[in-house]
Amino acid sequence: MKALYITSIEPFSGKTAVCLALGRRFKREGYEVGYFKPLSTQPWEPVPGRALDEDADFIRRTLDLPESTEELIGILLTPSLAREMRCGCTDRDLMSEVQAAYEKIQDKDIVLIEGGGSLREGVSLGLDPKSVTETLDVQALAIVRYHNRVNQGDDCITAYRQLYDQLIGTMINAVPRREQKLSEKICTPCLEKQGIRVLGTIPFQEELQAISVDELAEVLNAEFLTLPEKGDVLIERLIVGAMGVDQALPRIRRIAGAKALITGGDRSDMQLVGLEAATRCLILTGNLRPMPEVLRRAEEFGVPVLLVRQNTLETVEAIEAVFGKTRLGQESKLQRFEDLFAENFDLERLYDLMGLS
């Protein structure tokens, strides 16, 4: 059995996406694939009384794994466990529990282990990436999210110093296209000279930051006024319709990509302009229902309309808090990431390092 622990320097760097891309590829090549998450810090209750990890459940379903979601998680950090650990009211050996859970899923060819969202996550529990990789004796891939030319080097070196012998390599994710050649031709060789393997430099792709209408509705607790079946439509741009109608039409048309227009429910003039300008979704604020003509035209154009209770500012803030941080829940997004990953990640080198070839 081979195992690969996938961690990152900061949250929302692409760990789950890499687990899925590798998992689906390994399965296509005939390997029996397993998945394990030693520590989940964000319990999710799909039904009352049943706490799970949402990412683990998503991967279980996507990779069609036979285990229950509970079996894929070592420790689920519930509020009660967090309180017990803080006050020293428990004598549980969490690492032993992680080891026991991990042993139960080792009857695979390859196990992908989704680690912490940072190198310090779980340190107070003794379940940080360094401790887990050493205890389970597994190799680690560290994902660095690109911010600037300096941070990619700093973060790769930090991962190397923290994980050292366990580090199989690093991957730099979401690199702007204009920076990719410099990253590959200058930064990567510099890191390699220091003994830090850079296995991939994945370009930034705007489509992967998109959010679906269903996800918008969930975040905003919105009501569908039209076309709930269009919930899988992806939105790449947000436009706030606070300007005058005369300025709105040319401005909205100039903005590329799939757009959602956020405007007051009483702004029927702006709503109709948005529909004419090929927006993909209308988000109406203030819990004010639009005129019937707006809903009729939205149906004609195939545009879902969401009604939210919040005002426009609150709505924008709520969406911005999650924009670019949603999982690859749509097959089109997942397939696009897989393509980028295959084109820009040295899979042959990874296979050699893992002893798969």
Task: Mark where each language-model region is.
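N-terminal phosphate/diphosphate-binding loop that engages ATP/GTP or pyrophosphate donors
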Residues: 3-13, 17-92, 97, 101-102, ...
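Fold-independent oxyanion-binding glycine-rich loops
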Residues: 8-9, 38-39, 72, 114-117, ...
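Non-catalytic interface/targeting segments
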Residues: 201-263, 320-357
